[in-house]
Amino acid sequence: MVIPNTQKSWIGKAHLIGQTLTASYIRPGPVGDGFIYDPPTYEHPDTSGYDESAWMLLDGTPASCTNIGLYYNRRKKPVDLVISGPNYGRNSTALYIISSGTVGAAMEGALSGVKAISLSYAFENRSIPPPHVKEATTRSVELIKYLWENWDEQTQLYTINVPMIASVASAEPVFTHILENTWGSVFHEVGGSKTPADDGKRQFRWGPDFDAADRTVAESSGNNDGRVIEQGCISVTPLRANYKDIPTIQGEITLD
């Protein structure tokens, strides 16, 4: 298990070039009824009683965690499957998938020649009852086992979105395609204030219009990932690890 040591949302498949990554280690605690567990962190694996249950924390991106995990933190045999997640928040439709660190980490595995799965929990309310999380996890394990045993030879990675609903334990998995949606600016200009910190300079604060993304799903049709989740099903999208080209556009380009 290799994970970032801080929040790394919206970072895609980036690596922080020029940065030397530093590892620390934790031992995960027992599964309880809550979400928060703050274990002690160790700088060296030997002081944490390092074994199969120890987790490596890296001050890098999700994709970097995958790469380090594949080549420097593996056990006695090569890794045969990368599982990235679960992420608390949906990674469906083009708007979210392209920016997703969770999907980016799975993509890194696929680009290393390893089968990969990205797992995300899609919720409408952040107050998720712990039993729903447990049921979603159980359902996800069942689905991942199925995909592993029935892997499509053309697929390099799957991205899964599980709706965090009361009936998640029986939610049906459905193969989907990505909804190709767009939106406007993801920033708001900070106006009307001048402080010594900004010295009157123009500033822009992160503030995507998530409602606009939701509208693209509501207005869409067909078996896309966004609609399937809204219908209470689990979206399973098989992917190749590339930016898809347009095969019908070919030939020499003549410039006047």
Task: Kindly label every feature range from the protein language model.
Residues 131-256:
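Electrostatically charged, flexible surface regions
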Residues 80-81:
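Structural motif
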Residues 69-76, 104-115:
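Alpha-helix C-terminal capping segments
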Residues 112-126:
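Class I SAM-dependent methyltransferase SAM-binding "motif I" and its flanking Rossmann-like core
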Residues 84:
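Redox-cofactor binding/interface segments in oxidoreductases and associated redox assembly factors
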Residues 1-70:
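A cross-family phosphate/adenosyl-ligand binding-site feature
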Residues 61-62, 87-90, 165, 241:
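Short glycine-rich anion-binding loops that position phosphate/pyrophosphate groups of nucleotides
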Residues 97-104:
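Charged helix-capping and loop-helix junction motifs
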